[in-house]
């Protein structure tokens, strides 16, 4: 027996047979051992062959085990396992059969044929199941066709379409493919190309997520329903699984052999099979090593002659990177562009998929949720494409609601925690014997009984609601199953059964679902539901917030009031700049009300004024208000961009330069936090060419970084600060604010009236007109007066108070001390910054010495007052 002439699977079967005989201590390796090994092979051809004949491989396997158990065992040092003469004859016969069939190698089917032709118990067992040489040969012809065994792994080329492809038409017939809404133009174009005589190979090109694969699935559904031209009726649409083709191809040439078998099978179908190759670019280079042919080169001849009809799908970037470089491959495919559907089309697609997702998750999805998913994803998720991102939103929102239904309700959880707390207290009181404890125990037991009763009622209500939701889900699943059956009966022409379902069972089930839904809504109005089963607009907004960090949750009445009072919130930290605060507040309100231009940033402002008047503080306060986090402020010091080449630090270095993969400081910050406040400090210090990148940001709300990615700035607030015109502002008459405790000036000096024009004139000398023209507002920050400094003193001292509270020390500052600090910290030129230094020097330094000396400890209340010409500290006694 020359095992070199055996295939890999046949050699494995012989080795497994020997191992089995040795393990069972059998003296000889016989046909039973070999047949057992052949049936045990996972990816072998024998089990499918026996099934094709009509016998049961499992039954044969069990019978063989019984036979092997009855065989005598040989033990002892002299025991050896030999090959039985009958098995040697069977192997020799298998070799003769291989030569007779002009096969180069002995395969597993030759061994089975040889065993069936022997005069042994194994052959008789096979014959009893109808497995004879004739039935084996007939079944083998169906599986193998006219192929010869020319390699040591022929099994990989048998039934290759079933192994390496998914039958989309079968899936469509079984309604296992989601419905495809719209895309009629693209499907018609694909059918048009497929109907050509040569080069009948369309390739779908589009951005990821626009629905390229869905178009092919739509074509499969049309083929099944017969809504296609005559040339495509009855065709099979198979999706090639390139991963399965490559997997397990250990030796050189195995991959090419498998792919060749697929191509030949498609060619032999005489146009009956259309091959769909998803991610077409993966063919280029697949299987190639050391200059050997790759998959795309194997496909080219068949594609050019029109013998292989295929549909490709790939993204624009991959098509340009891989397919366009291979001109010979590119010309064999006809391009079909798939554009992103509009918002209206996406809403229609979601409405078509709505029922599928409702059945899967067991919840109801409101129409407003579908509209919100489309509109909000289009507005806020800019790095992905419709309809994919909208479908994902609905799917995750429904999944989140399903988890809430299956988890214990919050109200019930709170009652459980309260009961646990009361039980702990009760256990503690039982140890006490004083009258007060006994009285408290009586009250506690009554309270505990009330909570236990409430918990029992809530648990019953929860189980009832869960039961109703589960019942509704079962009804919907049954309804979907009946609809699939009705479609299949209609397609097969069994109109009686189709009519029975359409006019009998389906309407009856729809009525049950309607009554159950009405009952749920009625009960929710009366007793207040513990569980929600409807996905609404608010759920979609929460998922958007989780994905992007953008607070787009629906504005409640309290939140609306919060934005109406925005000025007063900002003025608590930004003093004396009423006009600037009002303008920025109006911009935020316009955005929240949905009135702002969605193609531009939320607001872009140039703040000019002297140092220390609140320009940077306004940006910090705004970030804190919008996100409850000052870290949402991205601050870029423009004095670092005084050279022309420094622009690459903002948007990232171009290809070929050091740092290309790192990205830009500005673009990366916005990509990670798309909803943020951008502060460009001291803009006049940057190089003039740096401002060119602002033109695109301010006008279109977008910027392309060094790697070609488009970064969205539409959800940012851009604040630029500058000290231009500071000398004019300082020389103007003391400005006054419109706060309640400060009088409104009746007249303005000539300098104050001409100040805005002077500032604008100076800005035109520093910045180009196209830059200034794109800014929403130029905010002139006025210099701070003594009264303003007095108000800022309160704000700064409050920060000191909060810092001391962490050490459990209270601080009270008298008015005289505040007035002293305000006077020491007032500087007409430097704004509020000297005040901070004065508080550090006069108050914090002295206070630190007192605390470290041990004079004041935790729990103390320190009073700060004036003693002669300096601050003094005393401890307040209760």
UniProtKB/Swiss-Prot annotation:
Keywords: ATP-binding, Chaperone, Coiled coil, Cytoplasm, Nucleotide-binding, Repeat, Stress response. The Clp repeat (R) domain probably functions as a substrate-discriminating domain, recruiting aggregated proteins to the ClpB hexamer and/or stabilizing bound proteins. The NBD2 domain is responsible for oligomerization, whereas the NBD1 domain stabilizes the hexamer probably in an ATP-dependent manner. The movement of the coiled-coil domain is essential for ClpB ability to rescue proteins from an aggregated state, probably by pulling apart large aggregated proteins, which are bound between the coiled-coils motifs of adjacent ClpB subunits in the functional hexamer. The keyword Repeat applies. Homohexamer. The oligomerization is ATP-dependent. Residues 159-340 are annotated as: NBD1. PANTHER family: ATP-DEPENDENT CLP PROTEASE, HEAT SHOCK PROTEIN 104. It is found in: Cytoplasm. Residues 83-146 are annotated as: Repeat 2. ATP 1 binds at residues 206-213. ATP 2 binds at residues 609-616. Residues 559-783 are annotated as: NBD2. Belongs to the ClpA/ClpB family. Residues 341-549 are annotated as: Linker. PROSITE patterns: CLP_R, CLPAB_1, CLPAB_2. NCBIfam families: chaperone_ClpB. This is Chaperone protein ClpB. Residues 6-71 are annotated as: Repeat 1. Part of a stress-induced multi-chaperone system, it is involved in the recovery of the cell from heat-induced damage, in cooperation with DnaK, DnaJ and GrpE. Acts before DnaK, in the processing of protein aggregates. Protein binding stimulates the ATPase activity; ATP hydrolysis unfolds the denatured protein aggregates, which probably helps expose new hydrophobic binding sites on the surface of ClpB-bound aggregates, contributing to the solubilization and refolding of denatured protein aggregates by DnaK. GO terms for molecular function: ATP binding; ATP hydrolysis activity. GO terms for biological process: cellular response to heat; protein refolding. Residues 784-878 are annotated as: C-terminal. Residues 391-525 form a coiled coil. The gene is clpB. Pfam families: AAA (PF00004), AAA_2 (PF07724), AAA_lid_9 (PF17871), Clp_N (PF02861), ClpB_D2-small (PF10431). GO terms for cellular component: cytoplasm. It comes from Treponema pallidum (strain Nichols). Its main location: cytoplasm.
């Amino acid at each position: 027996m020359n095992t070199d002439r055996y295939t890999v699977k046949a050699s494995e079967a012989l080795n497994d047979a020997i191992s089995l005989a040795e393990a069972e201590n059998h003296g000889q390796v016989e046909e039973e051992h070999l047949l057992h090994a052949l049936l045990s092979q996972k990816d072998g051809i024998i089990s499918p062959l026996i099934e094709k004949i009509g016998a049961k491989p499992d039954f044969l396997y069990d019978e063989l085990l019984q036979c092997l158990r009855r065989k005598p065992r040989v033990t002892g040092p002299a025991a050896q396992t030999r090959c039985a003469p009958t098995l040697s004859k069977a192997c020799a016969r298998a070799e003769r059969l291989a030569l007779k069939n002009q096969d180069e190698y002995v395969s597993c089917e030759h061994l089975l044929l040889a065993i069936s032709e022997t005069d042994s118990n194994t052959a008789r067992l096979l014959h009893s199941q109808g497995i004879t040489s004739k039935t084996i040969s007939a079944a083998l012809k169906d599986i193998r066709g006219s192929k010869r065994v020319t390699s040591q792994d022929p099994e990989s080329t048998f039934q290759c379409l079933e192994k390496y492809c998914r039958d989309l038409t079968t899936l469509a017939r079984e309604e296992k493919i989601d419905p495809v809404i719209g895309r009629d133009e693209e499907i018609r174009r694909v059918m048009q190309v497929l109907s050509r005589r040569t080069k009948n190979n369309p390739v779908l090109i589009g951005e990821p997520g626009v629905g390229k694969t869905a178009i092919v699935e739509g074509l499969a559904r049309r083929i099944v329903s017969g809504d296609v031209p005559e040339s495509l009726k009855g065709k099979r649409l198979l999706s090639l699984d390139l991963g399965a083709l490559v997997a397990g191809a250990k030796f050189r040439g195995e991959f090419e052999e498998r792919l060749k078998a697929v191509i030949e099978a498609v060619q032999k179908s005489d146009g009956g099979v259309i091959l769909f190759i998803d991610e077409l670019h993966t063919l280029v280079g697949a299987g190639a090593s050391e200059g050997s042919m790759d998959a795309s080169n194997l496909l080219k001849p068949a594609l050019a002659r029109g013998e292989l009809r295929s549909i490709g799908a790939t993204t624009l970037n991959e098509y340009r990177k891989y397919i366009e470089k291979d001109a010979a491959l590119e010309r064999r495919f006809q391009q079909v562009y798939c554009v992103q559907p509009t918002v209206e089309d996406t809403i229609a697609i979601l409405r078509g998929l709505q029922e599928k997702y409702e059945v899967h998750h067991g919840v109801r999805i409101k129409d407003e949720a579908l509209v919100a998913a489309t509109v909000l994803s289009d507005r806020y998720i800019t790095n992905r494409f419709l309809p994919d991102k909208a479908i994902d939103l609905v799917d995750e929102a429904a999944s989140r609601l399903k988890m809430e239904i299956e988890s214990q309700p919050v109200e019930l959880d709170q009652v459980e925690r309260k009961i646990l707390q009361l039980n702990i207290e009760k256990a503690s009181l039982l140890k006490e014997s004083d009258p007060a404890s006994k009285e408290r125990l009586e009250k506690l037991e009554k309270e505990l009984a009330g909570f236990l009763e409430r918990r029992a009622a809530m648990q019953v209500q929860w189980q009832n609601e869960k039961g109703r939701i589960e019942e509704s889900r079962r009804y919907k699943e049954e309804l979907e199953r009946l609809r699939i059956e009705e479609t299949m009966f209609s397609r097969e022409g069994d109109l009686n059964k189709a009519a029975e379902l359409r006019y009998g069972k389906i309407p009856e089930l729809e009525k049950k679902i309607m009554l159950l839904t009405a009952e749920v809504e009625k009960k929710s109005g009366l007793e207040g539901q513990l569980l929600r089963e409807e996905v609404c607009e608010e759920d979609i907004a929460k998922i958007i917030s989780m994905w992007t960090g953008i607070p787009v949750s629906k504005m409640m009445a309290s939140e609306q009031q919060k934005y109406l009072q925005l000025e007063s919130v900002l003025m608590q930290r930004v003093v004396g700049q009423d006009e600037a605060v009002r303008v920025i507040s109006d911009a935020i309100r316009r955005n929240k009300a949905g009135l702002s231009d969605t193609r531009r940033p939320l607001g872009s402002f140039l703040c000019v004024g002297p140092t220390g008047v609140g320009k940077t503080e306004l940006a910090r306060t705004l970030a804190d208000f919008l996100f409850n986090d000052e870290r949402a402020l991205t601050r870029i010091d423009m004095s670092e961009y005084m050279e022309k080449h420094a622009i690459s630090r903002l948007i990232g270095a171009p290809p070929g330069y050091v740092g290309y993969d790192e990205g830009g400081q500005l673009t990366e910050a916005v990509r990670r936090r798309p909803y943020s406040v951008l502060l460009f400090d001291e803009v006049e210090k940057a190089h003039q060419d740096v401002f060119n990148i602002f033109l695109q940001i301010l006008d279109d709300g977008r910027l392309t970084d060094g790697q070609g990615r488009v970064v969205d700035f539409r959800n940012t607030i851009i604040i630029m600060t500058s000290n231009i015109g500071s000398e004019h502002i300082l020389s103007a008459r003391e400005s006054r604010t419109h706060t309640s405790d400060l009088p409104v000036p009746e007249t303005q000096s000539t300098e104050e009236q001409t100040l805005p024009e002077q500032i604008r004139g100076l800005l035109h000398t520093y910045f180009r007109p196209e830059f200034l023209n794109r800014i929403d507002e130029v905010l002139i920050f006025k210099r701070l007066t003594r009264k303003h400094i007095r108000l800022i003193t309160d704000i700064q001292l409050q920060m000191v108070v909060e810092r001391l509270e962490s050490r459990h020390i209270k601080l009270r500052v008298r008015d005289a001390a505040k007035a002293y600090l305000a006077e020491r910290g007032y500087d007409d030129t430097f704004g509020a910054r000297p005040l901070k230094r004065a508080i550090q020097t006069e108050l914090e330094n002295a206070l630190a010495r007192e605390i470290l000396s041990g004079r004041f400890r935790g729990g103390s209340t320190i009073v700060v007052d004036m003693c002669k010409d300096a601050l003094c500290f005393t401890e307040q006694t209760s």
